[in-house]
């Protein structure tokens, strides 16, 4: 039999029996980046593919959740199981409740899975790697700046601005060139 028949593509349905296979391996779910957008997405898919590959090499059952059929992470031979699902909490929660993974990896898929961190944590699932608090401190620009200063990590001169007046004052203090970035955004559409 072709290897394609040994892989599972899974789609959610209601009111039907469960006919997927199970293993004795520890399960880890990787949440992908979803749709690619100009300037965002491909690098996160690359991270997810390598994460899934490492999980499989180390004896874990690698389960991928992603909504983009045009990515490498959704190829038939990448993960042990693949769920084509919107990367919204209700759909992700349904997969997690069904699979009962030992842990969930959200750090490889960019901003989309990071936005699910609190929900995943509050639902009692283990987030692999960074804790919810650490994730928050890296996404909040002010907290991250303070963390770097506390650890004596060199960083570019920066300021936090919460108004247009503070922004102009900060730019005048720092000088050009200047990079403006909001908290809790890596890039893409949310940069508006």
Task: Please state what every model-predicted region is.
Residues 1-5:
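Short, small-residue-biased leader/transition segments that mark boundaries at the very start
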Residues 75-85, 89:
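Structural recognition of alpha->loop->beta junctions
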Residues 38-44, 52-61, 65-79, 101-139, ...:
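A short, GP-enriched loop/loop-strand-helix hinge that lies immediately N-terminal to
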Residues 7-10, 14-51, 56-61:
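C-terminal accessory/binding modules appended to enzymatic or scaffolding proteins
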Residues 97, 135, 139-192:
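Active-site nucleotide/adenylate-binding loops and adjacent lid/helix of ATP-dependent enzymes
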Residues 88-98:
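A structured beta-alpha segment of the ubiquitous adenosine-cofactor-binding alpha/beta core
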Residues 19-28, 96-100, 171-174:
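Glycine-rich phosphate/diphosphate-binding loops that line cofactor/substrate pockets in enzymes
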């Amino acid at each position: 039999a072709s290897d394609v028949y040994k892989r599972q593509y899974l789609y959610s349905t209601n009111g039907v029996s469960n006919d997927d296979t199970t293993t004795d391996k520890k399960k880890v779910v990787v949440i992908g980046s979803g749709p690619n957008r100009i300037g965002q997405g491909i690098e996160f898919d690359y991270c997810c593919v390598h994460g899934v590959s490492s999980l499989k090499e180390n004896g874990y059952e690698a389960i991928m959740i992603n909504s983009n059929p045009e990515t490498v992470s959704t190829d038939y031979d990448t993960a042990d199981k693949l769920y084509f699902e919107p990367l919204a909490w209700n759909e992700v929660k349904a997969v997690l409740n069904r699979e009962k993974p030992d842990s969930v990896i959200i750090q490889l898929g960019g901003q989309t899975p990071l936005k699910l961190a609190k929900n995943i944590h509050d639902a009692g699932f283990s987030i692999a790697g960074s804790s919810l608090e650490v994730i928050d401190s890296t996404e909040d620009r002010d907290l991250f700046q303070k963390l770097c200063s506390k650890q004596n990590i060199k960083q570019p001169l920066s300021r936090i601005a919460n108004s247009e007046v503070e922004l102009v004052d900060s730019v005048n203090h720092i000088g050009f060139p200047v990079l403006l970035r909001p908290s809790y955004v890596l890039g893409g559409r949310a940069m508006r």
